[in-house]
Design a protein with these regions (language model features):
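Extracellular and organelle-lumenal recognition/adhesion modules and their flexible linkers in secreted
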Residues: 1-282, 299-301, 309, 315, ...
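Active-site-proximal beta-strand/loop segments in catalytic clefts of secreted hydrolases
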Residues: 26-29, 240-243, 303-307, 349-353, ...
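Structured segments of extracytoplasmic/periplasmic soluble domains
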Residues: 27, 214, 292-296, 320-324, ...
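Substrate-binding cleft of extracellular glycoside hydrolase catalytic domains
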Residues: 187, 298, 319-330, 344
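Noncatalytic carbohydrate-binding groove/subsite architecture in carbohydrate-active enzymes
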Residues: 194-205, 363-445
Length: 445
């Protein structure tokens, strides 16, 4: 039996569909960045997190039978040289094991000592720019090699002769003893289980501050294939850097070299623990994000760190994005090669404030008072910004207090709803019920 269905279109009633109807949230969480959008191939390349019992950083293995390994630390607010990575400014936020380096001490002459990392995916038609940052106390040769899984086949290698950096007796300032060495590794093979090793044989100490390796076709440190997929699906509004990660993000760290930017530990470690041990290596900065938006045709939508960044710091971010090249932060943007303002209009006043997983003001009135101060400081830089408030919705108290109080300054609201589905993949009927629940979700949001 056939059934006929008719669709009637009322041409007298029209409405405008926003070009931003289809948007995405690009958050530094789970595998979204590392092994996702980022082209960086080295995992835990800045040695963050608690080391293993043998002193070797997570995702790395030690080389040598009788070698001492340890993680060297930089204490919060310290300028001491214990680690290479650091934050641009101390904003009061403190996280564990962000600023560290890998120490290697070889007590036996001619013993091969160092570290290695497995499971690198190599392509024969690609070259790989490689860099390592080291500090030594005496001359030694640092050998870098790309090999197969058991080390019997060397695909590419190079040796960096390293001399210690010595301070002059009359030096007035502290000397940076860290040195960065670069090369291009061209393995010429396809291997999904390759190994990178960094070794030396002298009876000496080697400190490694950061390691970097990316394919030569990356787009602003991002994977070209992933960028093309984002372009293909037609994202028109892209929110960044979160999400929950907005509460960890320090936008001013972009003024440091990418290798020197300290990793950022997530307050909600459980989200990224299985993927990056709870740390983000800060591979993507504001300039990279804007370049991505322009490449895929999306409007940029930035989220401030309302809990830890002051109104002045958030206003400075607006000036970096939108200020003329003659302004303080616009000048910094121009010096980085971007003379014209980015004209970022959409800004989120924090993320999901009111939920327990976000730090800062978690009451409707407290949140509204906090972000209103931030918003007014930002509007002094760019008066026509479009602010979006956040909160735990549906929640009538937040509607009555927060939304109404912020309405004159933030007319848009971001509703983050979490829906539960009865997962049942044990039978065709269960799968059909699960599917139907999923497709009905928009009706309730």
């Amino acid at each position: 039996q056939q059934h006929s269905h008719y669709l009637y279109i009322d041409l007298k009633t029209t409405s405008t569909v926003s070009p931003h109807l289809f948007g995405h949230n690009l958050e530094h969480t789970r595998a979204s960045i590392m092994d996702g959008l980022s082209a960086q191939m080295i995992r835990n390349r800045k040695f963050a997190g608690a080391a293993a019992r043998n002193g070797v950083a997570l995702d790395w293995e030690g080389i040598g039978e009788c070698v001492y390994f340890a993680n060297e630390h930089r204490l919060p607010g310290s300028n001491a040289n214990e680690a290479y990575v650091c934050h641009y400014a101390h904003n009061g936020m403190w996280r564990r094991n962000e600023c560290q380096s890998q120490m290697i001490q070889n007590p036996i002459p001619n013993q091969v000592s160092g570290i290695r990392q497995k499971e690198l995916f190599l392509q024969k038609d690609r070259s790989y720019p490689f860099a390592v940052v080291v500090k030594v106390q005496q001359p030694l040769d640092v050998r870098v090699a790309l090999t197969n899984a058991d080390g019997t086949q060397i695909y590419a290698e190079t040796v960096f002769p390293v001399q210690p950096v010595l301070a002059k007796e009359d030096a007035q300032e502290e000397v940076d003893e860290w040195q960065r060495f670069e090369t291009i590794l061209t393995p010429g093979v396809d291997d999904a289980h390759a190994v990178i090793s960094i070794t030396y044989t002298e009876q000496a100490q080697l400190l490694i501050g950061a390691v970097s390796m990316m394919p030569d076709n990356h787009f602003h440190t991002m994977r070209r294939d992933t960028v093309e997929k984002l372009k293909e699906i037609g994202v028109r509004l892209l929110r960044w850097p979160g999400g929950n990660f907005a509460g960890e993000y320090r936008w001013q760290d972009m003024f440091l070299h990418p290798d020197r930017r300290a990793p950022m530990e997530g307050y909600m470690e459980n989200e990224t623990q299985p993927f990056t041990h709870g740390y983000d290596m800060h591979e993507i900065d504001t300039d990279d994000f804007i370049a991505l938006c322009r490449e895929i045709g999306a409007e940029p939508f930035l989220t401030i760190n309302a809990a830890w960044d002051s109104p002045e710091v958030c206003a400075a971010w607006v000036e970096y994005c939108n200020g003329p090249a003659e302004s303080k932060y616009g000048r910094l943007r121009a010096q980085r090669g971007h003379q014209e303002p980015y004209n970022v209009k959409w800004w989120s006043l924090g993320n999901e404030m009111g939920y327990g997983h976000m730090e800062g003001a978690n009451t409707p009135d407290g949140y509204a008072s906090l972000v209103e101060t931030h918003a007014r400081a930002m509007l002094k830089v760019t008066p026509d910004l479009k602010f979006v408030s956040s909160g735990p919705y549906p929640n009538q108290e937040w509607v009555d207090v927060s939304i109404k109080k912020l309405a004159p300054i933030a007319p848009y609201v971001s509703l983050h709803t979490y829906n539960s589905v009865h997962w049942d993949f044990t039978s065709p009927e269960g799968m059909e019920r699960c599917y139907n629940e999923m497709i009905r979700m928009p009706i309730h949001n």
